[in-house]
UniProtKB/Swiss-Prot annotation:
<feature type="disulfide bond">
    <location>
        <begin position="179"/>
        <end position="199"/>
    </location>
</feature>
<dbReference type="GO" id="GO:0060369">
    <property type="term" value="P:positive regulation of Fc receptor mediated stimulatory signaling pathway"/>
</dbReference>
<feature type="glycosylation site" description="N-linked (GlcNAc...) asparagine">
    <location>
        <position position="90"/>
    </location>
</feature>
<keyword id="KW-1003">Cell membrane</keyword>
<keyword id="KW-1015">Disulfide bond</keyword>
<feature type="glycosylation site" description="N-linked (GlcNAc...) asparagine">
    <location>
        <position position="32"/>
    </location>
</feature>
<feature type="domain" description="Ig-like C2-type 1">
    <location>
        <begin position="19"/>
        <end position="126"/>
    </location>
</feature>
<dbReference type="GO" id="GO:0009897">
    <property type="term" value="C:external side of plasma membrane"/>
</dbReference>
<feature type="glycosylation site" description="N-linked (GlcNAc...) asparagine">
    <location>
        <position position="97"/>
    </location>
</feature>
<feature type="glycosylation site" description="N-linked (GlcNAc...) asparagine">
    <location>
        <position position="83"/>
    </location>
</feature>
<dbReference type="Pfam" id="PF07686">
    <property type="entry name" value="V-set"/>
</dbReference>
<feature type="modified residue" description="Phosphotyrosine">
    <location>
        <position position="322"/>
    </location>
</feature>
<dbReference type="GO" id="GO:0050862">
    <property type="term" value="P:positive regulation of T cell receptor signaling pathway"/>
</dbReference>
<dbReference type="InterPro" id="IPR036179">
    <property type="entry name" value="Ig-like_dom_sf"/>
</dbReference>
<keyword id="KW-1133">Transmembrane helix</keyword>
<comment type="subunit">
    <text>Interacts with PVR and NECTIN2. Competes with PVRIG for NECTIN2-binding. Interacts with ITGAL; this interaction mediates CD226 localization to lipid rafts.</text>
</comment>
<keyword id="KW-0812">Transmembrane</keyword>
Amino acid sequence: MDYPTLLLALLHVYRALCEEVLWHTSVPFAENMSLECVYPSVGILTQVEWFKIGTEKDSIAIFSPTHGMVIRKPYAERVYFLNSTMASNNMTLFFRNASEDDVGYYSCSLYTYPQGTWQKVIQVVQSDGFEAAVPPNSHIVSEPGKNITLTCQPQMTWPVQEVRWEKIQPHQIDLLTYCDLVHGRNFTSKFPRQIVSNCSHGSWSFIVVPDVTASDSGLYRCHLQASAGENETFVMRLTVAEGQTDNQYTRFVTGGTVLLLLFVISITTIIVIFLNRRRRRERSDLYTESWDTQKAPKNYRSPISASQPTNQSMDDTREDIYVNYPTFSRRPKTRV
């Protein structure tokens, strides 16, 4: 092998090792794990093949409705399929006694008629769980049947190169949409749920989950990356339950109602206390004035009414008479 050929071969191996593999679903490694592969459309299944992706594709198993199932020797004792699922386009691969060597990327390729080839890539990673490692930035609560829009907008002003939306569950992460804005490529999702998204140049991104149900509850992550390596991540929790609404709006309305009620109660209490004190003061002043009027001495005689009978006893009409007279000095007379 000449030098240029060797260099090209090494370059090919390097690119294969370093190039990021776009996956549809990521699952944590376990000794007994399952790699889900369910074809969502209706079609005639002609062949299914599983591969492990490394520097090369390593065939694990192949299935044909005509020729049956063949599992390659390195995996014959460690993987299996459920017979009950093979007739319904469900070619989920099950592992038993898996080892750390089984960490990596796997590909499930289905050949159907008349749709053609359908492929799903699954990543197996070392992880204890996914939800605990990503605390949400916000929480959205909704009733079933609504269309929910999830939005993320970066704080920085750098141009966005890649946008990735994911749904995070304890047992797996599903890629909802991937946009390569530089090369104009959109990665087709294999998520078994219709998700509407925008893949256009801009400073923000959104997805729409139409007609939500309880199964749509969970964490949703938006990852934005720039060409220079800058990146931002937003995590939102969606809860779908009967009789629930957006908790932020509910808290706002409830808080405003409580504050308004407290304000009305305070104003009413102040007015009632003020009126009670005013009435007490008025009653006290009236009582004092009446009492002083009754105790005041009279220095006049009330005239006799002309309507009184003339033969009325003088004793009955007798009243106290007060006469003002000068005060005379009582000095003793001087004797001559």
